[in-house]
Amino acid sequence: FRDDGVIQVRAGSTGPKFPYTPNEGHMHNFTWRLDVDLNGAGGDSAYLTSHSEDFMPPLSTATDGRERIVIEKGLLWNPRNFNTLLIEDSTLKNGSNPPRATSYELVPLRTGTARHSEPFTKRDFWVSRYDPAQSFLADNLPNYVQNRQSTVNQDLVIWYTGSEHHENNSRDE
């Protein structure tokens, strides 16, 4: 966490080159698990936000959207809509005038997405209710949301998968 509340994550990878295809580029998928407890466990809801702009002359317009995620599920990030995921507490208000709900906004990496054969790579965000048995990705995210439980005013866990394309170079020895 930074002083301004921003969560900054970093990921790196290392290892030997593939012995039979040493110059082949490939993708790395990173998944972060965020157990969001604003004002304690429970009372949190998630929203998929969007921002679209129309630059057709003579008028330019912008539209902001906010869709409440009401059941556990996986979500796709659409770069044309500048999607973000907003996690908001229903009872905790900040000091602005008028007071607004306290929230975190998850802004995805702008590096593109990878769709591989693993089921968890088919979506960018996953919203699930907290379950202590679901701490690791090994069981695959689609299994965590298959019950489609309510996510309104609950103890939420947000899973975010970002991808990086890796072109091999001389440092990868």
Residue ranges and their predicted role:
Residues 2-6, 16-173:
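Extended effector regions of multi-domain proteins
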Residues 9:
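Active-site-proximal segments of catalytic enzyme domains
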